[in-house]
């Protein structure tokens, strides 16, 4: 059997092993854990986070919410290289569903936020 755990910066591989061992106590099993990537959280006090927060609020009127909720992305492979990773996009209330969609305004705002970030990057 193979399964995937989307762990956070608050979870270690050791804790996952202990969880599985606890719940399978008394059963004859062999457990092999591998970890292909590691969770990350960019410090909210970094320049890129401060700049995107400012851009989002100025352009959309929405105060950004910092969160590690959601799925995984390829950004998890960049963080170990020392890249300050942030992820930002359109609302995802229809993500991975039939008729997944967004509005033209959200795409335009996304463009404006990224343009702002590039202009402010000094």
Spell out what each predicted region is:
Residues 1-122:
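Metal-dependent amide/peptide-bond hydrolase catalytic core
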């Amino acid at each position: 059997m193979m399964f995937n755990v989307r762990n956070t910066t608050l979870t270690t591989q050791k804790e996952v092993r202990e969880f599985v061992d606890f719940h399978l106590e008394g059963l004859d099993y062999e457990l092999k854990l591998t970890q292909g990537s590691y969770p990350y959280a960019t410090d909210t006090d970094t320049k890129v986070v401060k700049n995107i927060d400012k851009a989002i609020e100025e352009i959309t009127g929405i105060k950004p919410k910092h969160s590690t909720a959601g799925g995984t992305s390829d950004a998890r492979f960049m963080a170990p290289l020392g890249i300050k990773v942030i992820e930002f996009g359109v609302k995802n209330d229809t993500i991975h569903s039939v008729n997944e969609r967004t509005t033209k305004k959200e795409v335009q705002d996304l463009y404006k936020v990224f343009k702002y970030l590039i202009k402010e990057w000094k």
